[in-house]
Swiss-Prot record:
It comes from Bartonella tribocorum (strain CIP 105476 / IBS 506). InterPro entries: rRNA_ssu_MeTfrase_G, SAM-dependent_MTases_sf. Its main location: cytoplasm. This is Ribosomal RNA small subunit methyltransferase G. Specifically methylates the N7 position of guanine in position 527 of 16S rRNA. NCBIfam families: rsmG_gidB (TIGR00138). The lineage of its organism: Bacteria, Pseudomonadati, Pseudomonadota, Alphaproteobacteria, Hyphomicrobiales. HAMAP family: 16SrRNA_methyltr_G. It comes from the Bacteria. The keyword Flavoprotein does not apply. It is an enzyme of class 2 (transferase). GO terms for molecular function: rRNA (guanine-N7-)-methyltransferase activity. Signal peptide: none annotated. The keyword Cytoplasm applies. PANTHER family: S-ADENOSYL-L-METHIONINE-DEPENDENT METHYLTRANSFERASES SUPERFAMILY PROTEIN.
Length: 213
């Protein structure tokens, strides 16, 4: 590895210990594909390109250790592949597990499928609106979403996919407390808050036992 990649590898190990160099190489390949495709379709904001590794890849990577034992994952509104593709890369290293991605934008679906094929990832992309795939998605241990919708709306989208044991890992920004308060008016749920290792003003909400009033 050259010095810049070695530095990125050290940063990754701070987030997810014991990551293989093969996994690191897959993440670097993913980073390269994002940059190539972003010139043609809007996968990430141009303003965040200089911080792609930290703001998007490491930010996604921090989710995996929270439930690394889980085998069946589902990511809603997958967009440019955060956190879904990053999780898929870690699942590939485990040699077990699978993640289903749901995305309605055809160009982004094409990108996601290209990445999955090139990196040989254990993932499937559903080209559909979330509301249209409830009967198609296999039962999931973990559901993820990043920047998709306010928590109250997000729980409404997630609810039909839940089992008694399903856990939602939802990345939220500085207004998360207001979102939790608003959602609590309509939903019962157990909540664990994990402060982001990337941005101290952001959190990962670990939500379980979701039920409506």
């Amino acid at each position: 590895m050259d010095s810049s990649i070695e530095q990125k590898y050290k940063q990754l190990l701070d987030i997810v210990p014991s990551v293989s160099r093969e996994t690191m190489e897959n993440l670097i390949q993913f980073e390269s594909l994002i940059l190539q495709w972003n010139a043609h379709i809007n996968l990430i904001s141009a303003a965040t390109i200089p911080d792609l590794w930290t703001r998007h890849i490491l930010d996604s990577a921090q989710i995996f250790p929270l439930c690394s034992h889980s085998l069946q994952w589902c990511d809603l509104g997958s967009g440019g592949g955060f956190p879904a593709i990053v999780i898929a890369i870690f699942l590939k290293e485990k040699r077990s597990g699978h993640i289903n991605l749901v995305e309605s934008n055809g160009k982004k679906v094409a990108f996601l499928r290209t990445v999955i094929a090139q990196l040989n990832l254990p993932a499937t992309v559903y080209h559909a609106r979330i509301e249209d795939i409830y009967q198609k998605i296999p039962i999931s241990d973990i559901i993820t979403a990043r920047g998709l919708a306010p928590l109250n709306e997000l729980l409404q989208l997630i609810f039909p996919l839940l089992t008694e044991k399903t856990i939602a890992l939802l990345q939220k920004g500085r207004d998360y407390a207001t979102e939790v308060k608003n959602a609590s008016a309509n939903w019962h749920f157990d909540l664990l808050k994990h402060t982001s290792k990337i941005d101290e003003n952001s959190v990962i909400l670990e939500i379980s036992h979701i039920r409506s009033y």
